[in-house]
Amino acid sequence: MQLILLSSLLLLGLSLANGHETDPEGQILNSLVETVGRLEKKIDKVENAFLTVHRARSFGSGSERLYVTNKQVGNFEAVRNTCVQAGGHIPSPQLLNENKAFASVLERHNKAAYLVVQNSAKFTNWAAGEPNNADGNKLCVKADAQGAWHSASCDEDLLVVCEFSFI
């Protein structure tokens, strides 16, 4: 579709460059209008399909955020880089239902994963005795397989889970 649009634009450009000030019969312009119309319809279909899939994936959790793993493990920086490259970020659940959706991924894989806790967070899910950085080297936060939060070393290799917000 992009090739057709580019070809039409090229033809229009060549026509104008060869001294044709207009498209006398409107063929090139009409072709461009039709192509743009078809592209708009396809974009609408893709958007609707995407939203349908997103709603279906988030239906059980009630969360507008999607939590996905590639089943790899890594330290905090590696997880952050992986998530950024994928267009997401390290999970930062803001609500109970978001933490449940995040925890469901961890429970399926029976592993812990990093998360980011905002300073202004209204929701937290700290395990008993947490946060605890008594030894001074637990500068990160991880969620266990049940979704409870713990202080953690940023060097631990944990499950890569990324959060994607689409809406």
UniProtKB/Swiss-Prot annotation:
Signal sequence extent: 1-19
Function: Does not show any inhibitory activity against various snake venom PLA2s. Does not inhibit the endogenous PLA2 activities in various tissue homogenates prepared from this snake.
Annotated Pfam families: Lectin_C (PF00059)
Gene Ontology molecular function, alphabetical: carbohydrate binding
Protein name: Phospholipase A2 inhibitor alpha-like protein
GO cellular component: extracellular region
Subcellular location as annotated: Secreted
SUPFAM superfamilies linked to this entry: C-type lectin-like
Residue ranges annotated for the C-type lectin domain, each copy included: 62-163
Upper taxonomic lineage: Eukaryota, Metazoa, Chordata, Craniata, Vertebrata
Superkingdom of origin organism: Eukaryota
Keywords: Disulfide bond, Lectin, Secreted, Signal
Keyword Secreted among record annotations: yes
Assembly and oligomerization: Homotrimer; non-covalently linked.
Tissue expression remark: Expressed by the liver.
Species of provenance: Elaphe quadrivirgata
Gene3D superfamilies referenced in this protein's UniProt entry, alphabetically: Mannose-Binding Protein A, subunit A
